[in-house]
Curated annotation (Swiss-Prot):
Listed EC numbers: 3.6.5.-
Record: residues binding Mg(2+): 173, 193
Record key words, sorted: ATP-binding, Cytoplasm, GTP-binding, Hydrolase, Magnesium, Metal-binding, Nucleotide-binding
Organism the protein comes from: Prochlorococcus marinus (strain SARG / CCMP1375 / SS120)
Subcellular location per the Swiss-Prot or TrEMBL entry: Cytoplasm
Annotated GO CC locations: cytoplasm
Reported function: An essential GTPase which binds GTP, GDP and possibly (p)ppGpp with moderate affinity, with high nucleotide exchange rates and a fairly low GTP hydrolysis rate. Plays a role in control of the cell cycle, stress response, ribosome biogenesis and in those bacteria that undergo differentiation, in morphogenesis control.
Enzyme class, first EC level, given as a word: hydrolase
Protein name stated in the entry: GTPase Obg
Chain residues that bind ATP: 166-173, 191-195, 213-216, 280-283, 309-311
Species classification: Bacteria, Bacillati, Cyanobacteriota, Cyanophyceae, Synechococcales
NCBIfam families from the UniProt entry: Obg_CgtA, PRK12297.1, PRK12299.1
Classification via InterPro entries: G_OBG (IPR031167), GTP-bd (IPR006073), GTP-bd_Obg/CgtA (IPR014100), GTP1-OBG_CS (IPR006074), GTP1_OBG_dom (IPR006169), GTP1_OBG_dom_sf (IPR036726), OBG_GTPase (IPR045086), P-loop_NTPase (IPR027417)
Cofactor(s), names only, from the UniProt record: Mg(2+)
Length: 329
C-alpha cells in the first residue's frame, strides 16, 4: 500500500432546502391558508478517526467532497428531509487544518473520535411562517442557506511513544524488527527505508508500546534535503527518541552531530525530547576500539551510551530496560 501522510481537499457541506409556498384549500379544513413547509438542513462534513487505517491514500484522488443537500419543504407544513452527513474516515493521528489560515480544526488521535469541520446550511422557511393579520395569504418564502466550504490540509502524524532516528544504514529497521513483530524492508545499503515503520514492543507487564522507525536523516534534512525531513513530523508526538549510531562508521561522532543539528533545526522541541544514544553494530568492532569510542562519547555532553548488536540481538535487554525506565519518568 502506498504511504500517503498529507492530503489537500475541498469539503463542502450540504445546502439547506428551500421553503415553499403552499395553501390548504380543502373545504373541510376551517383553518386553511398558508401551509408551505420549511426546507431541510444540509448535511455536515464529519471526520472520524479509524484505527484500522494507516494512510491518507483515500484522499489522493478524492479532492472535492460534498455532503448531501437538504430537501425542499412540502405542503401541509411538512419539513423537507435533512441531507445526510458525509463521514470521512482517517487514520488516528490525523490533524485537520485550514489550508489558507493554518487554523487547526482538530487533531484526531482516538479511535472513533469525530470532528465536524463543515456545517450544513439551514433550511429555508415556508410561507406558513409569514401569516399575519395584514397578510392572510403570504407568498413569501426563503431559500436555504449554503453549507460551509473549506480548503483543508490533512496531515498524518503517527502515534508512537518511541521514535528511532539516525543516519541511513544505522540499523534502525533491523532494530525495530528484532524488538517487535514489524517486518520492514532491510538491506545493506542507505535509504532502504522509504516510509516510516511501526512496531509494537511488549513491556514486562504485557502492555504494548508503539515504536516508529523513520527513514534515515542526512545533513540538511530539516531544510528539505533527502528523505528524512518528510517524516520528522512522525516523531513530534513521541515521548522518547532512540538515536541509533553505526559504531563501525568512519566518524561516529560526526554522524551524531549531524542528527543532533537536524533535530535542532527542525524545531517542535525535538532537540529537548528525552533520548538514548545507542551504538549499533558493535560486533564489527573489537572490544578495545568499542571501549575507546564509548569513553570518547562519555567525555562530551553525553552522559550514557548503550552499545548493542541489533542483528545479533546482543544488548537489547539493557536497552529495553533503559527505555522502560525513561518512559516511566
Amino acid at each position: 500500500m502506498q504511504f500517503i501522510d498529507q492530503a489537500r481537499i475541498t469539503v463542502k457541506a450540504g445546502r439547506g432546502g428551500d421553503g415553499i409556498v403552499a395553501f390548504r384549500r380543502e373545504k373541510y379544513v376551517p383553518a386553511g391558508g398558508p401551509s408551505g413547509g420549511d426546507g431541510g438542513n444540509g448535511g455536515n462534513v464529519v471526520f472520524q478517526a479509524d484505527s484500522n487505517l494507516q494512510t491518507l491514500l483515500d484522499f489522493k484522488f478524492k479532492q472535492i467532497i460534498l455532503a448531501e443537500n437538504g430537501r425542499r419543504g412540502g405542503p401541509n407544513k411538512c419539513t423537507g428531509a435533512s441531507g445526510n452527513n458525509i463521514v470521512l474516515k482517517v487514520p488516528c493521528g490525523t490533524e485537520v487544518r485550514h489550508l489558507e489560515t493554518g487554523i487547526i480544526f482538530g487533531d484526531l488521535t482516538i479511535d472513533g473520535e469525530s470532528l465536524v469541520v463543515a456545517f450544513g446550511g439551514i433550511g429555508g422557511l415556508g410561507n406558513a411562517h409569514y401569516l399575519s393579520n395584514r397578510n392572510r395569504a403570504p407568498e413569501k418564502f426563503t431559500e436555504g442557506k449554503d453549507g460551509e466550504e473549506w480548503l483543508l490540509h490533512l496531515e498524518l502524524k503517527l502515534l508512537a511513544e518511541v521514535g528511532i532516528i539516525g543516519l541511513p544504514n544505522a540499523g534502525k529497521s533491523t532494530l525495530i524488527s528484532v524488538l517487535s513483530s514489524a517486518r520492514p524492508k532491510i538491506a545493506d545499503y542507505p535509504f532502504t527505508t522509504l516510509i516510516p515503520n511501526l512496531g509494537v514492543v511488549r513491556k514486562p507487564s504485557g502492555d504494548g508500546t508503539v515504536f516508529a522507525d523513520i527513514p534515515g536523516l542526512i545533513e540538511g534534512a530539516a531544510e528539505g534535503i533527502g528523505l528524512g525531513h518528510e517524516f520528522l513530523r512522525h516523531i513530534e508526538r513521541t515521548r522518547l527518541l532512540i538515536h541509533l549510531v553505526d559504531a563501525s562508521a568512519l566518524n561516529p561522532l560526526e554522524d551524531i552531530e549531524i542528527v543532533e543539528n537536524e533535530l535542532s533545526a527542525y524545531g517542535h522541541s525535538l532537540i529537548d525530547r528525552p533520548r538514548i544514544l545507542v551504538l549499533n553494530k558493535k560486533e564489527l568492532l573489537d572490544a578495545k576500539n568499542l571501549k575507546k569510542l564509548e569513553r570518547k562519547l562519555n567525555q562530551g555532553s553525553i552522559s550514557e551510551v548503550i552499545s548493542i548488536s541489533a542483528i545479533m540481538s546482543n544488548g537489547l535487554d539493557i536497552l529495553l530496560n533503559k527505555i522502560w525506565s525513561k518512559l516511566e519518568i
